[in-house]
Amino acid sequence: ELVRELVERAVTEKTGGVEIRTLARDDFFLHLCAHLYKEATTYPWIRMKRDMTLYKYIDLYMLLYETTTSAADEIAARAHALGLGTECYFAVSEAVNLFGDESGAGTRILRGLPDVDTNGLFSVISPEEKKEYRYTERDTVRRFFCADREKLLEEVGVWKP
């Protein structure tokens, strides 16, 4: 259902003299957020050291840098409408913590998502083990530069899908 809606809202963009179909800007942004969130909060990705890939944070940062106030409001509203508030909040706050927020768009998006449980942003799930973990280190920069992020996790309970 969600994928169908995203595809139906797709737009045609011109780049390098070529027209391509792509997701609407706010949907594209949220798609990036959802992927980053999934990888950063799923234990196997942490084990493979693919949970905090720099290029994904840079992509978000560059999009935030170019985002207007009205577009930031649209992203927050769309995230809320699609049930992607947590994913969006996580990805935006992490990108802002790593690179800053010169345009103010990141802060604007975060303010537009007041219902997100920020304590839950540090949870990690292990679907195969049916366990839930939580980061003991909440500082994004420290986590990013930690050579073994598995050591920053503590088991907190059973994960139920």
Segments from the language model and where they lie:
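Conserved NTP-donor binding/palm subdomain of two-metal-ion nucleotidyltransferases/polymerases, i.e.
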Residues: E1-P161
